[in-house]
Amino acid sequence: MRTDELDYELPQELIAQRPAEPRDASRLMVVDVPSRGISHHVFRELPRFLGPGDVLVLNETKVIPARLFASRPGGGEVELLFLGERGGAWEALARPSRRLRPGMPLSAGEGERLEVVEELGEGRWLVRGRDVPGLLERAGRMPLPPYIEPTPEAEASYQTVYARTPGSAAAPTAGFHFTGRVLRGVEEAGARIARVVLHVGLGTFAPVREERLEDHRMHREYYAVPEETARAVEEAERVVAVGTTVVRTLESWARSGVREGESELFIYPGYEWRAVDALITNFHLPRSTLLALVMSFAGRELVREAYEVAVRERYRFYSFGDAMLLLGGGRSLR
C-alpha cells in the first residue's frame, strides 16, 4: 500500500482545540461496515448500540506530566519529553539537543539535578535523576500534541475519566468522550466493561515517512491484559474496543498468547483480525498508523467515504474531536 493513500484534505478550522462540554456531547458517526451505512448521533447515545453479550474494553492508562524544562550549565534551556524508564535511567526526547553531551548535568524544578547519560539518536537521550516521577509530578507539564494550543484548560482536559495507571506520554483519545453517565448506560444496556493497559508513546502520532506503508517500523509500547479481562473477552459475543490502543493490546495478546509485554504490532490493510469486532475511535491525522489501522478494520474505500462525510458535515477532528463507531468490522468480516 502506498503511504499517499492515507492522505486527505482537512480544513484547519476542523481541528478541535478543546473537548466538547460535557464530554459526551461530542458527535458520534456510526458506520455499519457490512451495509456501508453511515448515521449521525451524539456520543451519549452510545449505550443504545450495545447490549448483552458485548464487552466494551477501555485502556485505563494515565498520562503523566512528562514535559519538563531544564537548564544547561552556563544557561540555555532544553525541553525534555520523558518517554519511559530504561534500566534505571529515563528515555527523553530533547529539544534542542545538539549541545547535550553524556555526563552533562541539568537543573530542573526547584534546582533538582538530572544527568545526561547517553545519546540514543533522533533527538532521544537517556537521562538519570534521583526521583524522576516525583520531579515530573512537581514540575512537569502535560505533553499535548503539537496541533493543540497549550492552554491550562487543554492540559486539564487531556485525561480520560477512567485513567488509573500512570505511564503514558500521550492520551488514548477515544476515551475522552466517556462520562460516568455513559459508562452507567453501557452497563444498564447489559454490556460488560473490561479494562486493559497500554502506555501510549509519542510514536503513536508519528507520520509515516516511507513511500511504502509496509516499510514503516512501529514503536514498542508496554501492554497488559488482566486475567479478568481475558476471561470477559473470551466469553464475549462481540468485543468493542475503545480506541486503537485497545485494538493493539487485544490483537497483540490474541496473536502471541502473552498477556503482558511489549507490542510493536503494526496493523494496516491486509491484516488478519483475531480479537475485535467493533471499534470506537476519533478522526485521525493523514499519513498516520492510526488511520491505516482503521482502514484495515473497515476497508479503505468505506473509511475514505466516512472521512469525506465527516468533513462535509463539519465533524471535529483529532484528539479533542468527535468520534466514530465502526460496527461489524475487523474479526466480524472473516
Swiss-Prot record:
Protein localization: Cytoplasm
Example of a GO MF term: S-adenosylmethionine:tRNA ribosyltransferase-isomerase activity
Gene3D superfamilies the UniProt entry points to: QueA-like
Transmembrane segments: none
InterPro entries hit by this protein: QueA (IPR003699), QueA_dom1 (IPR042118), QueA_dom2 (IPR042119), QueA_sf (IPR036100)
Keyword Cytoplasm: yes
Disulfide bridges in this chain: none
Recorded superkingdom: Bacteria
A biological process from GO: queuosine biosynthetic process
This protein's UniProt keywords: Cytoplasm, Queuosine biosynthesis, S-adenosyl-L-methionine, Transferase
Pathway membership, UniProt: tRNA modification; tRNA-queuosine biosynthesis
Protein family: Belongs to the QueA family.
Record protein name field: S-adenosylmethionine:tRNA ribosyltransferase-isomerase
Species per Swiss-Prot/TrEMBL record: Rubrobacter xylanophilus (strain DSM 9941 / JCM 11954 / NBRC 16129 / PRD-1)
Gene: queA
